[in-house]
């Protein structure tokens, strides 16, 4: 009986695809070797321990209908669109070895006519007259008895959009320079004009089969067709939840300040697991009572624009004479945390 499993997703939903990855990883026998091929529509994917409010321009993402998805592996934030082909290799220990999966991807690229090399811990690069250029990045996760290696291959990704949705580390940009970061990335279409997602998936699949000396039929999956995934809805609900994608952020503090015609306002938040654990409000308004009441009500509130706006506007019933000020405050707070 084969120990291989091949899954190909027909869905572009990042929450679905990452939920499938998580489910298969948890449920597979430790003797199984899995290849999962997928791609996401416009999404910022962040590492397991990252803070989306720090890493991402969440307001612009909301305006452009770009999703946020937290993965279960570490590492940094990346932008996915349909110009990326994503792969995940899973295996039980001691067989799990990321050098094997890296070898399979390199063999797939070689079969397409692209000579690439592994560089550092996470990247695959091609040599060009302008120097090495990255065509693939990876991340990894291991538990006691299994591990996975997942990554992307840049086919025809819109590289310019990365800067639209990520808030770069100013120190990192100052050290590397924006042009050097941009220039070291390449799409495979620059090397192989016309290359498609389907061709890349086929090449990776054939390299996977060749390495293990077995062939199996692919399981094509989508939200309407999830073979052998009992109780998958629970995993999907977690992966798509605000509590996972935003609420799993490390604890942080946020200071908001603004001057209105009726007075200056400072709001100090301490946030843990996406919930405000401590709030302080300072103002030189002639009527500070609404702000003082707001600080108490914000404690325990989720750190999300709609909830903060609702909490601010709920004060109107108590302070109807300050309705215009409170609506102005509510709109400002909601906009500041988007």
Swiss-Prot record:
SUPFAM superfamilies reported for this sequence: Class II aaRS and biotin synthetases, SufE/NifU
The keyword Translocase is assigned to this record: no
GO CC annotation, single: cytosol
General remark: In the transfer reaction, the free carboxyl group of lipoic acid is attached via an amide linkage to the epsilon-amino group of a specific lysine residue of lipoyl domains of lipoate-dependent enzymes.
The protein's name: Lipoate-protein ligase A
Pathway named in the protein's UniProt entry: Protein modification; protein lipoylation via exogenous pathway; protein N(6)-(lipoyl)lysine from lipoate: step 1/2; Protein modification; protein lipoylation via exogenous pathway; protein N(6)-(lipoyl)lysine from lipoate: step 2/2
Keywords: ATP-binding, Cytoplasm, Ligase, Nucleotide-binding
A single GO molecular function term of this UniProt record: lipoyltransferase activity
UniProt-listed Enzyme Commission number(s): 6.3.1.20
Superkingdom to which the source organism belongs: Bacteria
Positions annotated to bind ATP: 71, 76-79, 134
Catalytic activity, reaction form: L-lysyl-[lipoyl-carrier protein] + (R)-lipoate + ATP = N(6)-[(R)-lipoyl]-L-lysyl-[lipoyl-carrier protein] + AMP + diphosphate + H(+)
Subunit structure: Monomer.
Origin organism lineage: Bacteria, Pseudomonadati, Pseudomonadota, Gammaproteobacteria, Enterobacterales
Residue intervals of the BPL/LPL catalytic domain: 29-216
Pfam families from the UniProt entry: Lip_prot_lig_C, LplA-B_cat
Summary of the function given for this chain in its UniProt record: Catalyzes both the ATP-dependent activation of exogenously supplied lipoate to lipoyl-AMP and the transfer of the activated lipoyl onto the lipoyl domains of lipoate-dependent enzymes.
UniProt main location, coarse: cytoplasm
PANTHER family according to UniProt: LIPOATE-PROTEIN LIGASE (PTHR12561), LIPOYLTRANSFERASE 1, MITOCHONDRIAL (PTHR12561:SF3)
Residues annotated as binding (R)-lipoate: 134
Cellular localization per UniProt: Cytoplasm
């Amino acid at each position: 009986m084969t120990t291989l499993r091949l899954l190909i997703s027909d869905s572009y939903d990042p929450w679905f695809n990452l939920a499938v990855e998580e489910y298969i990883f948890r449920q597979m026998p430790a003797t199984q070797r899995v290849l999962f091929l997928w791609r996401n529509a416009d999404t910022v994917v962040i590492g397991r321990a990252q803070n989306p409010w720090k890493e991402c321009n969440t307001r612009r993402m909301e305006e452009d209908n770009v999703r946020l998805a937290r993965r279960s592996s570490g590492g940094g934030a990346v932008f996915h669109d349909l110009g990326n082909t994503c792969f995940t290799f899973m295996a039980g220990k001691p067989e799990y070895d990321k050098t094997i999966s890296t070898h399979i991807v390199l063999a797939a690229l070689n079969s397409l006519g692209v000579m690439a090399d592994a560089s550092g811990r996470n990247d695959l690069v091609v040599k060009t007259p302008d120097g090495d250029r990255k065509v693939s990045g990876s991340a990894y996760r291991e538990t006691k008895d299994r591990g996975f290696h997942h990554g992307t291959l840049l086919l025809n990704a819109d590289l310019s959009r990365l800067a639209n949705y990520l808030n770069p580390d100013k120190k990192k940009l100052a050290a590397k320079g924006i042009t050097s970061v941009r220039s070291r990335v390449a799409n495979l279409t620059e090397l192989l004009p016309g290359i498609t997602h389907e061709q890349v998936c086929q090449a990776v699949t054939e390299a996977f089969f060749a390495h293990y000396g077995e062939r199996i039929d692919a399981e094509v999956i989508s939200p309407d067709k999830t073979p052998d995934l009992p109780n998958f809805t629970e995993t999907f609900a977690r992966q798509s939840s605000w509590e996972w994608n935003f609420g799993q952020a490390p604890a942080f503090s946020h200071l908001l300040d603004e001057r209105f015609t009726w007075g200056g306002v400072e709001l100090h938040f301490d946030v843990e697991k996406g919930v405000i654990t401590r709030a302080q409000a300072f103002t030189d308004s002639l009527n500070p009572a609404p702000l003082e009441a707001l600080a108490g009500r914000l404690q325990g509130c989720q750190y999300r624009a709609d909830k903060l706006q609702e909490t601010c506007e709920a004060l109107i019933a108590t302070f109807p004479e300050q309705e215009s000020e409170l609506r102005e405050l509510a709109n400002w707070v909601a906009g500041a945390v988007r």
